[in-house]
Amino acid sequence: MKKNYVDFSSAYKAIGKTEKQFKQAAVKAVEAGGEYASRYLRVKTPVDYDTKTHMRDHIVYSKPTVNKPVSEVGFDKQVAWRAHFVEFGTIKQDPQPFIETTMKDIENKVANIIQSEMMRRMK
């Protein structure tokens, strides 16, 4: 009697390899998006020439990992505490909403960067 079976081990290995490649591509794509966002935020951040420490010089972004494929863009600890004063204003300072407008400006561009990176890496 003949046994009818199909060996799927090679298919499972290929799926596992593709999944690993997809995760690595996602990390690289998100990193590219975060890098673009940090550069654009640097351009849009207002500068006060009366101070020596400029927020523009303290923009950072986190590197994504396979477990956390997210890149957070913002200011380092040295100037982050005062970013909201510029964004929302104070009693004596008018608001300069650069963070919110930057997010709105680059939302579609960052999505396109991530999508094109994923497509390029998954070919």
Language model region names:
Residues 1-123:
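Short, Lys/Arg-rich flexible segments
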